[in-house]
Amino acid sequence: MRIDYNDRLFRASSNSAGGDVDDQTLFSYRQYGDLVWATYQGGAIAFGTMVGVVRGDGTLDLRYQHVSLTGGIKGGRCVSTPEVIDNDRVRLHESWEWTEGGYGAGTSIVEQVMPST
C-alpha cells in the first residue's frame, strides 16, 4: 500500500537518549510524487526541516536539520518505516543518526495526530 504523506501531522511518541525531539515536537509533512518534506518545531526544537524520498519499499529516506531553543544547529539522516494503525493513521519507526552538530544514533517513533476540529 502506498501512503500519501501530504498534509499529515505527526508527534513523537518515543525517542532514544541523545535525540532532540520529544512529545512536544510536531511535524508537518508534505509530498509531491516520491518527494517528501516536512517542517517541525516544539519541545527543544525552535525550527527544523526534513527532505527526502519515498523508496520503492515504502520507507522514507530523509535528511534533517534543526535549530534548538539554545541556538545550536544540528543535522542528520533518518530512515522511516511506515505502519498503518487505527483509523488509517500512520506510525513511523525511525532509525536516525547525527551527521552534524551531534554524535550517535538511535531510534524513535512518531505517530500521526488528527487535527483538532
Where are these regions (language model features)?
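Short, solvent-exposed aromatic-acidic interface loops
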Residues: 42-47, 66-70, 95-102
